[in-house]
């Protein structure tokens, strides 16, 4: 039997052939193209440190690569020592990218123009490289961009009006480049903006005046929030007068007068210099003689200051080498408390039933080491004898009178809870204020999370982390229960200390009330501070809840809030977690160390519940945050439900 094709059947077959050719290729083909582009990228930028298994068909399990719907949607390679120029033809194939993070590398040259092919790109983080040239116009076609960070590069040229096309943009960081010209009114709904340390001039547009001065420092810009502009738009460097105009008679005569000094003027200058030098020599001789005649038994603080170690962001306590104390070479003690002279000394004041096994003399004689410098002063570990260790905090910026100090510190000393570091004693004089606490052998939670993670430090599993969270929450709940206005005022991981069994003890409670109102000490807990707090001495209970929520997020992510640059491209930790939780990639939030040791599904469910609690605690509006008693209840319930699931 023979088959005959009629003209209509022939047309129909052609139609279906064209239809098949017009259909999109299977996703596996697109993913293969993505993989090829990623390998080309790695080869071009020296990514030998990227341990990608090229034998895998899919790149979705590679470090820094995230897929969705069979395509690569995110590439996050911060701090991977990448270097060199990104060639054209790579991003043109990664067309489904929504997040690209190449920050803190050594990439150079201009941005590839095919970056404009990534029309779905929402977050672009390129800060901390050496990209140069003008910001390419193709970026302004990426209408879905929400976060753009080009800071810490070598971009030049003017800030283009093309930025106005990025109508969804919320973050724009351009600081520390070589951008020049004036600053345009971008007319964007920006939440974060910075153009500091560029070659910009002119006035700051009204729409950008809502940002603080830090966003514009290191430029020649003027206007709110910087200095007021003159009528011409810039402040002249010197007043213009006839005498300053070259070629005028007055100007020439003035120059001649300035060129010549009379003999009397010269003699006066010489005599003045000799007399001044003589006075300086006499003053120095008196000072040295006075210092040599001083006879006190105090410890010279100037010597110990050489041993004090600054802890960046207060992330960790200082660990001294074994059997070594930071002691003053002229005295057996390293804790400088008071000037002890022949007229006698004041005594330590102990609280409640605290065992008085030592006095101020013992404290002065004790060998000690610096633990770290905190918001309210320097902490020392004092070794009184073979079995007695205490922590001594030497307060700074406390200027209140004896009676007021006594009233406030007695409130602190009366606090008694198993999850608080007990205040055992204090010393007060006009020049020195000392607080004596129990010594916590495991140091702080901050040190445990962000300190040395060598072979000697076991990984922190979820049971330990959630237990620390519960203990700290109970301590704060106790503080809040004492009075409706009672708060900690400085909640952060470095103020959560640990016993040998990892039981949490909250420290530094009540000390915010002691700091002088005129203190210029910078607030070192910015990453923990609630947005409504303007005075560190007046912190509400709901602000404590916010700070504790940041600690919860810190436990879950392993990230330090004080290091804002590392917390997802310049956002603080709380906002970063809020944003990624909305995008539903929670598994990328959790600490990789934690994920590597926890394989039980129930644990991940607990972690997700704790993440939600951390998000609730860090709500922008105080009324939306839970109270501490509710926080304690929720942590108890999620820990109990986890125990029930595993039997």
UniProtKB/Swiss-Prot annotation:
Residue(s) carrying Phosphoserine: 367, 444, 540
A Gene Ontology term for the protein's cellular component: plasmodesma
Membrane topology (UniProt): Single-pass membrane protein
Gene3D superfamilies with a match to the protein in the record: Phosphorylase Kinase, domain 1, Ribonuclease Inhibitor, Transferase(Phosphotransferase) domain 1
UniProtKB keywords: ATP-binding, Cell membrane, Leucine-rich repeat, Membrane, Nucleotide-binding, Phosphoprotein, Receptor, Repeat, Signal, Transmembrane, Transmembrane helix
Tissue-by-tissue expression: Expressed in root tips, lateral root primordia, stipules, and floral organ abscission zones.
Source organism superkingdom: Eukaryota
Pfam assignment, any one: PK_Tyr_Ser-Thr
Subunit structure: Interacts with At3g17950, At3g27210 and At5g05190.
Name the record gives this protein: Probable inactive receptor kinase RLK902
Encoding gene per record: RLK902
């Amino acid at each position: 039997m023979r088959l005959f094709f009629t003209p209509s059947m022939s047309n129909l077959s052609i139609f279906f052939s064209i239809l098949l050719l017009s259909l999109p290729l299977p996703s596996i083909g697109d993913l293969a193209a993505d993989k090829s582009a990623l390998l080309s990228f790695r080869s071009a930028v020296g990514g030998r440190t990227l341990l990608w298994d090229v034998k895998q068909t899919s790149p979705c399990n590679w470090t820094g690569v995230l897929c969705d719907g069979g395509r690569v949607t995110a590439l996050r390679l911060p701090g991977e020592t990448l270097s060199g120029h990104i060639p054209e033809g790579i991003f043109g194939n990664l067309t489904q990218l929504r997040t690209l993070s190449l920050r803190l590398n050594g990439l150079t040259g201009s941005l590839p123009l095919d970056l404009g092919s990534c029309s779905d790109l929402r977050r672009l983080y390129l800060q901390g490289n050496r990209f140069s040239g003008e910001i390419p116009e193709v970026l302004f076609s990426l209408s879905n961009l929400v976060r753009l960070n080009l800071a810490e590069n070598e971009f030049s040229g003017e800030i283009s009006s093309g930025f106005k096309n990025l109508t969804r943009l919320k973050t724009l960081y351009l600081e520390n480049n070589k951008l020049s010209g004036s600053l345009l009114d971008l007319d964007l709904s920006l939440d974060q903006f910075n153009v500091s340390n560029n070659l910009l001039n002119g006035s700051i547009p009204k729409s950008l005046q809502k940002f603080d001065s830090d966003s514009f420092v290191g430029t020649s810009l003027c206007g709110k929030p910087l200095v007021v502009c003159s009528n011409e738009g810039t402040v002249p460097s010197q007043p213009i007068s006839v005498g300053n105009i070259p070629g005028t008679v007055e100007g020439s005569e003035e120059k001649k007068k300035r060129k010549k000094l009379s003999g009397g003027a010269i003699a006066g200058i010489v005599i003045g210099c000799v007399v001044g030098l003589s006075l300086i020599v006499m003053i120095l001789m008196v000072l040295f003689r006075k210092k040599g005649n001083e006879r006190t038994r105090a410890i010279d603080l100037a010597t110990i200051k050489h041993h004090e170690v600054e802890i960046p962001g207060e992330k960790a306590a200082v660990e001294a080498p074994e059997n070594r104390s930071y002691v003053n070479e002229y005295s057996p003690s390293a804790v400088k408390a008071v000037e002890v002279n022949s007229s006698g000394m004041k005594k330590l004041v102990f609280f409640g039933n605290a065992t008085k096994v030592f006095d101020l003399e013992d404290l002065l004689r004790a060998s000690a080491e610096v633990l770290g410098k905190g918001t309210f002063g320097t902490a020392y570990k004092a070794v009184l004898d073979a079995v007695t260790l205490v922590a001594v905090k030497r307060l700074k910026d406390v200027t209140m009178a004896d009676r007021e100090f006594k009233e406030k510190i007695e409130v602190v000393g009366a606090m008694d809870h198993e999850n608080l570091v007990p205040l055992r004693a204090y010393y007060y004089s006009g020049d020195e204020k000392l607080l004596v606490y129990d010594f916590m052998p495991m140091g702080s939670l901050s040190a445990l999370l962000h300190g040395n993670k060598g072979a000697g430090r076991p990984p922190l599993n979820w049971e330990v982390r959630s237990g620390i969270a519960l203990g700290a929450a109970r301590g704060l709940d106790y503080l809040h229960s004492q009075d409706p206005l009672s708060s900690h005022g400085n909640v952060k991981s470095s103020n959560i200390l640990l016993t040998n069994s990892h039981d949490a003890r909250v420290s530094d409670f009540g000390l915010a009330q002691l700091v002088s109102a005129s203190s210029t000490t910078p607030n070192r807990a910015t990453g923990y501070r609630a947005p409504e707090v303007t005075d560190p001495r007046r912190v509400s209970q709901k602000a404590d809840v916010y700070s504790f929520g940041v600690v919860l997020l810190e436990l879950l992510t392993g990230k330090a809030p004080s290091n804002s640059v590392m917390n997802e491209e310049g956002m603080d930790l709380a906002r970063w977690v809020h944003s990624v939780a909305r995008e539903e990639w929670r598994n990328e939030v959790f600490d990789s160390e934690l994920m590597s040791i926890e394989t039980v599904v129930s644990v991940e469910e607990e972690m997700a519940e704790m993440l939600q609690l951390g998000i609730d605690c860090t709500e922008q509006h105080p009324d939306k945050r839970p109270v501490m008693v509710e926080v304690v209840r929720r942590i108890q319930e999620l820990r109990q439900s986890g125990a029930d699931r595993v039997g």
